[in-house]
From Swiss-Prot:
It comes from Escherichia coli O157:H7. The gene is rhaM. This is L-rhamnose mutarotase. The active site is at residue 22. Involved in the anomeric conversion of L-rhamnose. Its EC number is 5.1.3.32.
Amino acid sequence: MIRKAFVMQVNPDAHEEYQRRHNPIWPELEAVLKSHGAHNYAIYLDKARNLLFATVEIESEERWNAVASTEICQRWWKYMTDVMPANPDNSPVSSELQEVFYLP
Protein backbone atom coordinates (compact mmCIF):
# COMPACT_ATOMS: atom_id res chain seq x y z
CA MET A 1 0.00 0.00 0.00
CA ILE A 2 1.05 3.56 -0.70
CA ARG A 3 0.27 6.04 2.08
CA LYS A 4 -0.74 9.53 0.97
CA ALA A 5 -1.56 12.66 2.92
CA PHE A 6 -2.71 16.07 1.75
CA VAL A 7 -4.07 19.33 3.09
CA MET A 8 -7.05 21.33 1.86
CA GLN A 9 -9.00 24.35 3.13
CA VAL A 10 -12.60 24.73 4.15
CA ASN A 11 -14.46 28.03 4.27
CA PRO A 12 -14.60 29.42 7.84
CA ASP A 13 -18.40 29.40 7.91
CA ALA A 14 -18.72 25.93 6.36
CA HIS A 15 -17.24 23.54 8.93
CA GLU A 16 -20.57 21.99 9.89
CA GLU A 17 -21.79 21.81 6.29
CA TYR A 18 -18.56 20.15 5.15
CA GLN A 19 -18.93 17.54 7.87
CA ARG A 20 -22.62 17.02 7.09
CA ARG A 21 -21.84 16.34 3.43
CA HIS A 22 -19.34 13.67 4.43
CA ASN A 23 -21.58 11.81 6.87
CA PRO A 24 -22.13 9.78 4.89
CA ILE A 25 -20.59 10.48 1.51
CA TRP A 26 -22.59 9.44 -1.53
CA PRO A 27 -22.62 5.63 -1.83
CA GLU A 28 -21.61 5.94 -5.49
CA LEU A 29 -18.52 7.94 -4.52
CA GLU A 30 -17.59 5.43 -1.84
CA ALA A 31 -17.89 2.65 -4.41
CA VAL A 32 -15.66 4.49 -6.91
CA LEU A 33 -13.00 5.16 -4.28
CA LYS A 34 -12.97 1.54 -3.16
CA SER A 35 -12.99 0.16 -6.70
CA HIS A 36 -9.98 2.35 -7.48
CA GLY A 37 -7.99 0.92 -4.58
CA ALA A 38 -8.49 3.52 -1.83
CA HIS A 39 -8.45 2.25 1.76
CA ASN A 40 -8.52 3.80 5.23
CA TYR A 41 -9.39 7.27 3.89
CA ALA A 42 -9.78 9.83 6.67
CA ILE A 43 -10.17 13.61 6.75
CA TYR A 44 -9.46 15.71 9.86
CA LEU A 45 -10.60 19.30 10.47
CA ASP A 46 -8.41 21.93 12.14
CA LYS A 47 -11.14 24.41 13.09
CA ALA A 48 -8.75 27.12 14.24
CA ARG A 49 -7.02 27.30 10.85
CA ASN A 50 -9.84 26.11 8.55
CA LEU A 51 -7.64 23.29 7.31
CA LEU A 52 -8.49 19.75 6.32
CA PHE A 53 -5.85 17.04 6.64
CA ALA A 54 -6.52 13.86 4.69
CA THR A 55 -4.83 10.48 4.76
CA VAL A 56 -5.48 7.55 2.46
CA GLU A 57 -3.84 4.27 1.57
CA ILE A 58 -3.90 3.45 -2.13
CA GLU A 59 -3.02 0.40 -4.19
CA SER A 60 -1.51 2.40 -7.07
CA GLU A 61 -0.99 6.01 -8.11
CA GLU A 62 -2.55 5.30 -11.51
CA ARG A 63 -5.80 3.98 -10.06
CA TRP A 64 -5.95 6.80 -7.49
CA ASN A 65 -5.40 9.43 -10.19
CA ALA A 66 -8.11 7.82 -12.36
CA VAL A 67 -10.75 8.66 -9.73
CA ALA A 68 -10.59 12.31 -10.84
CA SER A 69 -11.88 11.49 -14.31
CA THR A 70 -14.98 9.64 -13.10
CA GLU A 71 -18.37 11.28 -13.50
CA ILE A 72 -19.21 10.85 -9.82
CA CYS A 73 -15.99 12.53 -8.69
CA GLN A 74 -16.64 15.44 -11.06
CA ARG A 75 -20.15 15.85 -9.58
CA TRP A 76 -18.78 15.66 -6.02
CA TRP A 77 -16.18 18.31 -6.72
CA LYS A 78 -18.82 20.65 -8.13
CA TYR A 79 -21.07 19.95 -5.12
CA MET A 80 -18.27 20.97 -2.75
CA THR A 81 -17.21 24.23 -4.44
CA ASP A 82 -19.41 26.38 -2.20
CA VAL A 83 -17.76 25.13 1.00
CA MET A 84 -14.08 25.08 0.04
CA PRO A 85 -11.61 26.72 -2.36
CA ALA A 86 -11.53 25.01 -5.74
CA ASN A 87 -9.36 24.98 -8.84
CA PRO A 88 -10.80 25.97 -12.25
CA ASP A 89 -11.74 22.30 -12.86
CA ASN A 90 -13.66 22.30 -9.52
CA SER A 91 -11.13 20.00 -7.83
CA PRO A 92 -10.33 21.13 -4.30
CA VAL A 93 -7.22 23.24 -3.86
CA SER A 94 -4.84 20.85 -2.13
CA SER A 95 -1.19 20.26 -1.37
CA GLU A 96 0.42 16.88 -0.91
CA LEU A 97 2.18 16.35 2.41
CA GLN A 98 5.54 14.65 2.84
CA GLU A 99 5.64 11.79 5.30
CA VAL A 100 8.35 12.41 7.90
CA PHE A 101 7.51 9.67 10.40
CA TYR A 102 5.60 6.39 10.41
CA LEU A 103 5.21 3.82 13.19
CA PRO A 104 3.78 0.59 11.80
